[in-house]
């Protein structure tokens, strides 16, 4: 299939960029962007490669994404080697095809076509690309955003190429994301022999009533834009592995995906109050992965909806469901942020794939968004 979007996607897939290793993907993108007049600034931090590229000046539309991918898993279970892109029955297979090398290729080709038609565009077009989104995400987009904010860089609109679609490209646009807060809690007891419980203090038994109340809390009812806040226990750990030892400590890890009805401080206060209510001895460590954000109808959402309607003749759902993305960092700059990308049915799975025609369509949509906001 001779198509610049498909060809570039295949070139990117061939580079096994397991997070945070970029494996040469960004060099490929940078070469293409410099060729059409972009200024490129590398912003590497630690083991992570990032770049910020721009063309023009004024009101700024940035396209954001990541070159890293998750591990392929058992390569023998793939219909073809995961880093050897193959097209079968119109589907392009390979790790990263949907998440998100197809989007990156569509962005670059859209920019090439846009610049060819609008060499003197009135506003600024930019790219923010990282190699660490799938892993720790500590030296990636968040560090670039901090640098841009320190020098008061302008960012008005940002389109993140995450695979937002569910059945056909453009059927879902993410115009916000829930916040993510993780609690690492340890309940302290006294270790002892199970035959002499009066000489010990079992932290699992102590914690059980508190955990029962915790999992039954209705945190909020959500709102027009967000589903209700969710709390899920992710990991439990206690004991020595022996059946005759009462554990001394009991570790519980739980995560909140929270709406704009709550703040992280409100959640923390309620959890601590619960621990105090049950008179537990504990230590606690919190990790805030991201605050909730929302982009309401405005120039960016309107441009995205227009592009989808023009090329796919559908009206997208505007949703805030799903996991976190780097959009949570970019929103700190005050930018309108949305996510539009290919169908996400196979992301992170064996035999990850994307409809090749969808990537061609996505490039056209991206180009039309550029035309509405940058030309």
Curated annotation (Swiss-Prot):
Record keywords: Amino-acid biosynthesis, Cobalt, Diaminopimelate biosynthesis, Hydrolase, Lysine biosynthesis, Metal-binding, Zinc
Active site (UniProt): 68, 133 (proton acceptor)
Sequence positions that bind Zn(2+) 2: 99, 134, 348
Pathway it works in: Amino-acid biosynthesis; L-lysine biosynthesis via DAP pathway; LL-2,6-diaminopimelate from (S)-tetrahydrodipicolinate (succinylase route): step 3/3
Positions of Zn(2+) 1 binding: 66, 99, 162
EC number: 3.5.1.18
One Gene Ontology term from the biological process aspect of the record: L-arginine biosynthetic process
Free-text comment on the cofactor: Binds 2 Zn(2+) or Co(2+) ions per subunit.
Top-level class of the enzyme under EC nomenclature: hydrolase
Catalytic activity: N-succinyl-(2S,6S)-2,6-diaminopimelate + H2O = (2S,6S)-2,6-diaminopimelate + succinate
Family annotation (Pfam families): M20_dimer, Peptidase_M20
MF terms in GO: acetylornithine deacetylase activity; cobalt ion binding; succinyl-diaminopimelate desuccinylase activity; zinc ion binding
InterPro entries registered for this protein in UniProt: ArgE/DapE_CS, Bact_exopeptidase_dim_dom, DapE_proteobac, Peptidase_M20, Peptidase_M20_dimer, Peptidase_M20A
Cofactors demanded by this protein: Zn(2+); Co(2+)
Intrachain S-S bonds: none
Family in the record: Belongs to the peptidase M20A family. DapE subfamily.
Subunit structure: Homodimer.
Function: Catalyzes the hydrolysis of N-succinyl-L,L-diaminopimelic acid (SDAP), forming succinate and LL-2,6-diaminopimelate (DAP), an intermediate involved in the bacterial biosynthesis of lysine and meso-diaminopimelic acid, an essential component of bacterial cell walls.
HAMAP family: DapE (MF_01690)
The protein's name: Succinyl-diaminopimelate desuccinylase
Natural source organism: Enterobacter sp. (strain 638)
């Amino acid at each position: 299939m001779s198509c610049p979007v498909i060809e570039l996607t295949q070139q990117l897939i061939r580079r096994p960029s397991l997070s945070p290793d970029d494996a040469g993907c960004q060099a490929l993108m940078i070469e293409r962007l410099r060729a059409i007049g972009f200024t490129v600034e590398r912003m590497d931090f630690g083991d992570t490669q990032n770049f910020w590229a721009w063309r023009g000046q004024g009101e700024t539309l940035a396209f954001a994404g990541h070159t890293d991918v998750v591990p392929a898993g058992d390569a023998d279970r793939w219909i073809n080697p995961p880093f050897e892109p193959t097209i079968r029955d119109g589907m392009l297979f390979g790790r990263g095809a949907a998440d998100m090398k197809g989007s990156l290729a569509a962005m670059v080709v859209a920019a090439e076509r846009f610049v060819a038609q609008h060499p003197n565009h009135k506003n600024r077009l930019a790219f923010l690309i990282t190699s660490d989104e799938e892993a720790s995400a500590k030296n990636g987009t968040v560090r670039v955003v901090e640098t841009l904010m320190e020098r008061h860089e302008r960012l008005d609109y940002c389109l993140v190429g995450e695979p937002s679609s569910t059945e056909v490209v453009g059927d879902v646009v993410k115009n916000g994301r829930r916040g993510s807060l993780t609690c690492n809690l340890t309940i302290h007891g006294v270790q002892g022999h199970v035959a002499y419980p009066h000489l010990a203090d079992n932290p699992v038994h102590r914690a059980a009533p508190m955990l029962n109340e915790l999992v039954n809390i209705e945190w909020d009812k959500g709102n027009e834009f967000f589903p209700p806040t969710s709390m899920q226990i992710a990991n439990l750990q206690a004991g020595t592995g022996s059946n005759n030892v009462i554990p001394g400590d009991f570790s519980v890890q739980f995560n909140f995906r929270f709406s704009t009805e709550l703040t992280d401080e409100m959640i923390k206060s309620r959890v601590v109050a619960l621990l105090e209510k049950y008179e537990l001895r504990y230590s606690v460590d919190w990790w805030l992965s991201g605050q909730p954000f929302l982009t309401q109808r405005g120039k960016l959402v309107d441009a995205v909806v227009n592009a989808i309607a023009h090329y796919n003749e559908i009206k997208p759902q505007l949703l805030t469901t799903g996991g976190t993305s780097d959009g949570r960092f970019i929103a700190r700059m005050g930018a309108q942020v949305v996510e539009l990308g290919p169908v996400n049915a196979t992301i992170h799975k064996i035999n990850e794939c994307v409809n090749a025609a969808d990537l061609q369509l996505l490039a056209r949509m991206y180009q039309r968004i550029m035309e509405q906001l940058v030309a």
